[in-house]
Amino acid sequence: MNKNDSRLRRARQTRLKIAELNVARLAVHRTNLHIYAQVFSEDGTKVLASASTAEAEVRKELNGNGGNTAAATLVGKRIAEKAKAAGIEAVAFDRSGFRYHGRVKALADAAREAGLKF
């Protein structure tokens, strides 16, 4: 089992546990160049809000690339604002098998500071 398979296995386990909670899910995906965040509905069928460093508005505010903690902080603030605008106050945090460290942690902390509860 390689590194990616292990990450996907962890992600599957997390998503099964979150599905039992029946709450909205904040999913994070990380690549070398970008970070993506999506808020899914309680049943997991609809994307209620999304934000990423690939968006034009975010790229204007970034002075470097989208693969750093400053960019993740900006995406965390934007996803919290969009989720609150969609009427979502509390979510379950789905780190998609990534370690809660660095960019993933920066995004989560920024979303919490912007008023999203998880």
UniProtKB/Swiss-Prot annotation:
Keywords: Ribonucleoprotein, Ribosomal protein, RNA-binding, rRNA-binding
UniProt GO molecular function: 5S rRNA binding; structural constituent of ribosome
InterPro entries documented for this protein: Ribosomal_uL18_bac-type, Ribosomal_uL18_bac/euk
GO cellular component terms attached to this protein's record: cytosolic large ribosomal subunit
One GO term of the biological process aspect: translation
Family from the record: Belongs to the universal ribosomal protein uL18 family.
Functional description taken from the UniProt entry: This is one of the proteins that bind and probably mediate the attachment of the 5S RNA into the large ribosomal subunit, where it forms part of the central protuberance.
Subunit structure: Part of the 50S ribosomal subunit; part of the 5S rRNA/L5/L18/L25 subcomplex. Contacts the 5S and 23S rRNAs.
PANTHER family to which the protein is assigned, alphabetical: 39S RIBOSOMAL PROTEIN L18, MITOCHONDRIAL, LARGE RIBOSOMAL SUBUNIT PROTEIN UL18M
Database matches in NCBIfam families: L18_bact
Protein name per its UniProtKB record: Large ribosomal subunit protein uL18
Gene: rplR
